[in-house]
């Protein structure tokens, strides 16, 4: 089995993801009001973990890079389960093991890393020493179906919030692994071409990463400060077979 995956994001009205670029709100609210609202709405979804990409994680929590040069190749690819006193995980996709973890509890949760099989034994020792859980997702670290089975069967995780960035969301969209979309729409605009949007799959021009996936609107709620919360259920073509 795999956990339920809810892609939970905040964007501007034009779908952009960089809040520092948004126009100022019409409403008289605190500077951190919308970001706090996003997190509060996320808590309503009652997930046991959030999942983000390496760039997003390092931008917020552990900026240093681990050098694995000359290390010993891993020969045993068993998952490692560290303690989880909070009952919630922050899971990061780090296929090559680039993050140097300085602490094991980002945002009051417990850290977990999804790795590729090309990391070194020394890096695994580093993770265990700091108290970071880990598991493997195939040779290149992109076998999410395998990773999700481990998350469910070994770690007991049944509900995950996928929180970007755009490229990571695109990978999951292409793989057909998203079950719901929870989108909080900020009452403002970015407007510039090329700024990351909610889903950005890096593929060929003729690829259609969302093919065979239809959205059912579950709810549309106007929140305080003009924020709009949209919830959709994904229906995949295989669901109808």
Model-derived features with residue positions:
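Enzymes that bind and transform nitrogen-containing heteroaromatic metabolites
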Residues: 1-241
């Amino acid at each position: 089995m795999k956990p339920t995956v809810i892609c939970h994001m905040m964007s501007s009205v034009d779908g952009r993801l960089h809040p520092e670029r948004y126009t100022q709100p019409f409403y008289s609210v605190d500077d951190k009001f919308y970001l706090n609202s996003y997190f509060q709405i996320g808590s309503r979804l009652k997930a046991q973990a959030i999942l983000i990409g390496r760039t997003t994680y390092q931008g917020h929590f552990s900026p240093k890079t681990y050098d694995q040069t000359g290390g010993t190749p891993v020969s045993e690819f068993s998952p490692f389960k560290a303690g989880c006193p909070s009952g919630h995980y922050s899971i990061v996709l780090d296929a090559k093991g680039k993050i140097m973890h300085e602490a094991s509890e980002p945002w009051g949760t417990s850290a977990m890393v999804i790795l590729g099989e090309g990391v070194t034994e020394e890096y695994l020792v580093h993770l265990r020493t700091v108290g970071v859980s880990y598991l493997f997702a195939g040779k290149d670290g992109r076998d999410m179906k395998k990773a999700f089975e481990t998350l469910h069967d070994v770690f007991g995780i049944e509900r995950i919030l996928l929180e970007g960035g755009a490229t990571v969301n695109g990978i999951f969209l292409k793989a057909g692994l998203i079950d719901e979309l929870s989108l909080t729409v900020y009452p403002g605009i970015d407007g510039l071409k090329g700024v990351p949007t909610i889903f950005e799959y890096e593929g060929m021009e003729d690829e259609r990463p969302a093919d065979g996936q239809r959205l059912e609107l579950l709810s549309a709620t106007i929140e305080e400060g003009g924020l709009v919360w949209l919830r959709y259920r994904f229906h995949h073509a295989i669901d109808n077979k």
